[in-house]
C-alpha cells in the first residue's frame, strides 16, 4: 500500500513538473537541434546555461550564469529571460519579478546592494509606473514614476518626519500639494520645481496663517 502511494506521488511530481518530465537533450547533437529537452551549455566567454530547450533555444525553466558573475534563475522564451524570474547581480543586488526579452518589465522587487528597495512596476528595464521605494536612512516614496523619476501623484516621507503629498514633475514638487513639517507647520497649495509658488496657505503650529501668492518660497501677495 505504501509503495503504491509513493509511486502515485512520484507520477504526480513527474507530470506536474515539466522540467522533471522532460528528457535530457542528446549531447551528440548540436544545441540548435535540441527541442523539448533539458540540457547544459558552456559558452566560450565562461557563461553557462542549464535548463529547458525548445527549437534550439533556451525556453522554459532554466538557470543562466553570466560572465560578470550575475545569475538568472527562472523562465526563458526565445533564448532570453521572459516571464517570472530572479536575477542576482554580481554587485550584490537582487531582482525578483517579471522579465520580457531579457529585461525587467512588468511587476517586480529590486533590492540594491546599498540597501535601497523598490517594489512596483517596470518598463524597458527601469522603474516606471506605480511603486514604493525605501532607503536605508528611512526615506520612503509611494506613488508614480516615469522613467525612474518621481512624476505624477506621490507621497514622500523623510526620516525627520517631514512629509510631502501631491504632484511631482521630474523628481520635484510641482503642481498642487501638501507639505507637512515634523514640527506641525503645514503648507497647502501650489509648487513649482520644488518651491512654494502660486496660491497657497501656510499654517504654523501656533495657529498663525500666511495665505496668498507665493513666489519661489516667499509670500509676495498676502
What annotation goes with each model-predicted range?
Residues 15-222:
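Glycine/tyrosine- and acidic-biased, solvent-exposed loop/turn segments at the edges of beta-strands
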Residues 5-14:
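Sec-dependent N-terminal signal peptides
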Residues 1-2:
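N-terminal secretory signal peptides that target proteins for export/translocation
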